[in-house]
């Protein structure tokens, strides 16, 4: 799951935080 490389920007930080805060059940 390498989205940071393609999403290098201010949104990447928010997206990464949401993914980390969102439990993938």
Curated annotation (Swiss-Prot):
Pfam families, per database record? NMU
> Which residues are annotated as modified residue Pyrrolidone carboxylic acid in the UniProt record?
18
Q: Where in the cell is it found?
A: Secreted
Alphabetic keyword roster: Amidation, Cleavage on pair of basic residues, Hormone, Pyrrolidone carboxylic acid, Secreted
Record GO terms (molecular function):
hormone activity
List, alphabetically, the GO terms of the cellular component aspect: extracellular region
In terms of InterPro entries, this protein maps to:
Neuromedin-U_amidation-site, NMU_C
GO BP annotation list: regulation of smooth muscle contraction
According to the UniProt entry, which residues carry Asparagine amide? 25
Superkingdom, taxonomy of origin: Eukaryota
Q: What does this protein do?
A: Stimulates uterine smooth muscle contraction and causes selective vasoconstriction.
Per the record, the similarity remark reads: Belongs to the NmU family.
Kindly provide the name given to this protein in its UniProt entry.
Answer: Neuromedin-U-25
Origin species = Canis lupus familiaris (Dog)
């Amino acid at each position: 799951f390498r989205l940071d490389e393609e999403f290098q920007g201010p949104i990447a930080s928010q997206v990464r935080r949401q993914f980390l805060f969102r439990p993938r059940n």
